[in-house]
């Protein structure tokens, strides 16, 4: 499907994320990074996103497909590296309703590409073209840190994580790990690492989030309103101290 829509400009396809590093968990996405030699126009972008809905299922849906997350970048926008870099297209299940209603996100400058490309360079499989470590330049530590800081800035009040508590808690664990080590770890690995560094009052929440992610316990973080808010505040403050 990707080749059918982008064949004329397709440079590389890299599989990364849980499928390569740590193994797929019950709700894990299939993460793909696609590089093209020229930015797709609006009609091509929209046609591809509509088709991708056919090979992706919402998390926990029990459908034939796993959730798909696909990012498309133009080679000239990321090689040589610059920050923030431009993202041509992003597809994910959180966009399904918008896509079906005819709302398509345009190309944007994306701070998160600094994290994504670092992740792909560390752990990925080239499905087309050279390895990510060969194709992409290293992201400078300064830009990686800025992207981490930019990411945590979005979580300030309960409304920012309501309905997505587990993912936000685990994302903060990964960011804490990355800010401290410069590396990117699977969610469960980062959560275990963080749990060893947390005050006792925050450990039950991170352990619960990790167990729910692994599928060994039910996800009840939505019921743990105060615990979640306290963890977010503590984790953010710790990460900010590390990054400054």
Residue ranges and their predicted role:
Residues 13-54, 58, 67-75:
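Catalytic metal-binding acidic patch
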Residues 136, 160, 164, 220-223, ...:
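Non-transmembrane, amphipathic alpha-helical segments
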Residues 183-244:
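Structured mid-to-C-terminal alpha-helical surface segments
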């Amino acid at each position: 499907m990707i080749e059918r829509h982008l064949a004329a400009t397709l440079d590389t396809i890299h599989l990364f994320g849980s499928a390569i590093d740590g193994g797929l968990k019950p709700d894990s996405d299939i993460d793909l990074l696609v590089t093209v030699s020229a930015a797709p126009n609006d009609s091509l972008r929209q046609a591809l996103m509509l088709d991708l809905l056919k090979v992706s299922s919402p998390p926990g849906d029990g459908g034939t497909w796993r959730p798909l997350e696909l990012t498309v970048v133009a080679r000239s926008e990321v090689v040589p590296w610059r920050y923030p870099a431009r993202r041509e297209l992003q597809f994910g299940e959180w966009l399904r309703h918008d896509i079906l209603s005819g709302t398509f996100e345009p190309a944007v400058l994306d701070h998160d590409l600094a994290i994504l490309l670092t992740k792909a360079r560390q752990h990925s499989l080239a499905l087309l073209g050279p390895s990510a470590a060969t194709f992409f330049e290293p992201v400078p530590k300064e830009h990686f840190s800025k992207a981490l800081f930019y990411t945590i800035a979005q979580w300030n009040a309960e409304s920012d994580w309501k309905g997505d508590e587990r993912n936000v808690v685990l994302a903060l664990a990964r960011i804490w790990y990355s800010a401290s080590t410069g590396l990117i770890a699977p969610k469960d690995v980062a959560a275990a690492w963080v749990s060893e560094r947390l005050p006792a009052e925050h450990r039950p929440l991170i352990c619960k989030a990790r167990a729910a992610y692994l599928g060994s316990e039910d996800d009840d973080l939505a019921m743990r309103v105060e615990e979640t808010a306290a963890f977010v505040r503590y984790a953010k403050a710790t990460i900010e101290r590390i990054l400054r």
